[in-house]
């Protein structure tokens, strides 16, 4: 194998696979793609069947399974921080919700110096370029991109429709497309699933086009030790194959592209001598360039589950029973449809809880079964639940190396719930969810409140529940943020400040977390920056209109008023 390439990409995840595919469209460009995990085994139902999404989080084959330091505002819990490992990265193990973030997220990014071309109208063409939506393209959606997107269909679980209707009856808007003109309100939720009912990871959508190209070399089980520098120019990568301790080196003629995600990208930069000087000195790492923002500004979405018994036998509870699973698996395997072909997050919504929020600050995912996201703590009866959490918490965390060992996990602290706004939003979210669940649309299905339980009412009781039970939505981001301020790590094209030949392209470069799931936006960002790397003209800006709430009230009159108790 040659050890010199035009580009070396570190991390074959949601962003890295996009770059590998787009850069190798130019036949005279050579690319080395390094992935610490293994292949995306297509015969492994755990990563290929949408309904099996909890399984990869339970093991270590596809999951880095990071843990946080004790979180001081969460009863000092060490909290899960699962990240994808293997071709596809976190798109290989995520919940497959195709949500892009709100138009105003991007317009807000673009207010920062150097990020003027990150408005929604600049980004929308790249969302469309990446997408192939099963019901065809329009001004907001693509029809022939690498990412297969499936829309909910008639005949799916009646609880989805009842929960959306309940949200509308509670006084909130209805929308027919959470990624379309109006991203506020309740409606159906698209998913990254192929027409054959398989998970649409970036390994399937992008790498399948590119993996046979002679100018792309993919190396799996390759753990990056550090980026090599000649002075201040990134010149290559040192990496370990499998369990070996002797490093292999590869050289980059043009650029090194770091796409290892919001946890590993700052870790690799720090190990390579780019980061906070005091930390690097403490670890005896030679300083290449001081960038105090590397590993800072860490953000995530936290969420809770509100669970209810279901009085009719329409939930997915029977699908949790072992005796029913072979039939579900066979139907999925041979026909590509049935329960197995859906992630079961087919309805959701975004709302504003208070007038001071210009765009939604709370997200709902509805699930027609009562169970933890990672498959634990299933309720032993028919049930359903709402996942609810705040979108743009003011809390900020950090990632820092604990040693030079590339196989040691870093110290991670999200500092969840460290602001009063966090507590206010989560209390509001629980109380609003209860109002939604009390609406007439759910009368035929709603049993008792299982969790938190109706005895949990006061601020103090709700706060105790949040501290003990809130969990990550697995959306770490923003730890190598774009911008030009003193804490920015990269510019608006992903180029690392103060050095040459090095970019970061993944969720870590978001300056602020978006309103929703991260995968679609991470792919969009990679598509957009790929054009910059290739020195191509950006796609023409969109002029599609989009909803801005303005002076509209956050909600109308609920059909059934519910006392806050």
UniProtKB/Swiss-Prot annotation:
Cofactor: FAD
Enzyme class at the top of the EC tree: oxidoreductase
Binding-site residues for FAD, renumbered to this chain: 6-35
GO biological process: glycine betaine biosynthetic process from choline
UniProt entry keywords in alphabetical sequence: FAD, Flavoprotein, NAD, Oxidoreductase
Region (Disordered): 541-565
GO cellular component annotations of the record: membrane
Catalytic site positions: 475 (proton acceptor)
Record Gene3D superfamilies: FAD/NAD(P)-binding domain, Glucose Oxidase, domain 3
Pathway note: Amine and polyamine biosynthesis; betaine biosynthesis via choline pathway; betaine aldehyde from choline (cytochrome c reductase route): step 1/1
Pfam family name, one: GMC_oxred_N
UniProt GO molecular function: betaine-aldehyde dehydrogenase (NAD+) activity; choline dehydrogenase activity; flavin adenine dinucleotide binding
EC numbers on record: 1.1.99.1, 1.2.1.8
Reaction equation(s) it catalyzes: choline + A = betaine aldehyde + AH2; betaine aldehyde + NAD(+) + H2O = glycine betaine + NADH + 2 H(+)
InterPro entries listed in its UniProt record: BetA, FAD/NAD-bd_sf, GMC_OxRdtase, GMC_OxRdtase_N, GMC_OxRtase_C
Family per record: Belongs to the GMC oxidoreductase family.
PANTHER family: CHOLINE DEHYDROGENASE, MITOCHONDRIAL (PTHR11552:SF147), GLUCOSE-METHANOL-CHOLINE GMC OXIDOREDUCTASE (PTHR11552)
Role description: Involved in the biosynthesis of the osmoprotectant glycine betaine. Catalyzes the oxidation of choline to betaine aldehyde and betaine aldehyde to glycine betaine at the same rate.
Protein name per its UniProtKB record: Oxygen-dependent choline dehydrogenase
Species, as recorded: Ectopseudomonas mendocina (strain ymp) (Pseudomonas mendocina)
Source organism phylogeny: Bacteria, Pseudomonadati, Pseudomonadota, Gammaproteobacteria, Pseudomonadales
